[in-house]
Amino acid sequence: RLVANGPTNQLVTWLNDPAAQDPAIAGGKGSALARMTEKGMPVPDGFVVTSGAFLMSASFQLLQALTPILRASATDTDAIGEASEHAMAAIASSPINPMLIDAISEAYKTMGGDAVSVRSSATAEDMADASFAGQYDSFLNILTFDNMVQGVRDVWASLYSTRAIAYRIQSGVPNSSVGMAVVVQRQIHPDASGVMFTRDPVTGANRFVVSAALGLGEGVVAGEAPADRVELDPNTGAAIKTEVVSKDAMVAALPEGSTSRVGVPEWRRLQPALGERSLVRLSELARQLEAMFGGPQDIEFAVVDEEVHLLQSRPITTLDDVEPTDATEWDGWVDPKFSWAQSFLGVFAGPVYQLQLDVADAFSDGMRQCFEETGAERTRNHIMTLVNDFVYVRVPEIDADVLAGG
């Protein structure tokens, strides 16, 4: 593991330097990685091009371009688009200070000049009420110093993309107060990668939910690769539910740099992306991250030879919209005159998702309409009902004599 070299440079700082734990210096992603590094968690080595370096590189043309942004509303798409174009052009055309080039070069050489990832880390991101996930650009498998510097410049420019400007306005984050740090880390070449939520982001249930694909994690984040889904007991790490899909594609690093979506050999497609050892380790780290950051986390990870590497941890921002519910009593939800069964013919075998509920509702409504048209009037819960996220279906009654006879 690399160590911080002397006093913190105002332009570049290492992830294991205490100064990098300040979001005002290293941005949201960088400061979280620095805190994880301090605790000895498996974070790839790296350094941060600080928000101060970004401010030093800001040109007069950029400052001019920001003026209309400060007056725009989230729905003023024309004004936002024009301001975005001018701001990004100003960043692309402004020379980078030679002092910063030297600082980045020294850090890059210290890391050995190997392949790196260049990732955004804005000073206002990954907050409890606004994640900014996907708003800024990041670049993987950068092989040369010049391309890395260009990646830093492109990350800066993404701070002023139309979607980022509009999202900040919508989230109440002043465009005048946000800066951009850049995290440069040693590139991991994983067997599998993915995301892990320490609460179900849809239902708020207390379980760990893992989505994992083969290759690089962009396959999961961008939806470019099929992903397995595993639900884990948060206390033991034991699998509650596992869905292994056919993974015919993945995102992989290319020998010439950058990444691409590639095919997966047929023999590997139905193998689980993650082994039991990796899932247990992920659960251990997830519990530590929840304790460290004080709440449910959205975690990005990569796995090499079943060893887990942490790439990011941020608060889950969707839970405020989830209303936790107590266990539903049977009374009032099912007609006691009939028999009911869960997992009828294998349909709705586990806790259901909202899309499945919508399908079930339409199915139930259609059946009820058929009964009404044939004169067999029935209420909605004569056919199908939902109790504690499980679908129950009415089944044929069994004569008591049959039950008594075994």
Regions found by a protein language model. Give the residues of each.
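Conserved divalent-metal-coordinating catalytic cores
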Residues: R1-K39, D45, V49-A58, D78, ...
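N-terminal beta-alpha lobe that positions the nucleotide/phosphoryl donor
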Residues: R1-V183, A192, R268-S278, L282-G294, ...
